[in-house]
């Protein structure tokens, strides 16, 4: 979407285009959990992340893509990632930034779910060490 639009317009229209078939301007909420493919090769490529497309809506779908594009446009960014919960966002960040063997120093008054994830999930994988 053009950078010339004002914030109010971006709030409504960023990350979407009118549907070419129905001409609807609103973003539909995709409740589908699976998507079709043109052929087996396309399915293979999408599952291998070698081609863009959707294969399971819990991982990505057109509704989430529109949300992410809209959030990036509102913040003037190049991309955004939406998570279903705060703990998912925190773990997504930690798993992206931290490498095997890293040490995480965390305040002991962090949200209990975060401490539990760090001291449980991450420690069980022996990927990080928590100091709190």
Where in this protein do the model-derived segments appear?
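Conserved N-terminal alpha-helix of the aminotransferase class I/II PLP-enzyme fold
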Residues: 39-88, 113-120
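N-terminal glycine-rich, Lys/His-bearing helix-loop that initiates the first secondary-structure elements
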Residues: 1-51
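Structural motif
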Residues: 28-29, 79-81, 102-103
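Conserved PLP-anchoring active-site segment centered on the Schiff-base-forming lysine
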Residues: 96-114
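Conserved small/polar residues in nucleotide/adenosyl-binding loops
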Residues: 128-132
């Amino acid at each position: 979407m053009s950078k010339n639009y004002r914030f109010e317009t971006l709030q409504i229209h960023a990350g979407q285009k009118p549907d070419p078939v129905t001409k609807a301007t609103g973003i539909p909420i995709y409740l589908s959990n699976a998507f079709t493919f043109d052929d087996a090769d396309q399915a293979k490529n999408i599952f291998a992340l070698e081609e863009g497309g959707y294969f399971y809506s819990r991982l990505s779908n057109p509704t989430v893509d529109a949300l992410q594009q809209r959030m990036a446009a509102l913040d003037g960014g190049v991309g955004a990632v939406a998570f279903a919960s705060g703990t998912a966002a925190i773990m997504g960040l930690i798993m992206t930034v931290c490498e095997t063997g890293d040490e995480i120093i965390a305040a002991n008054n962090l949200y209990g779910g975060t401490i539990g994830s760090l001291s449980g999930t991450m420690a069980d994988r022996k990927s990080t060490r928590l100091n709190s």
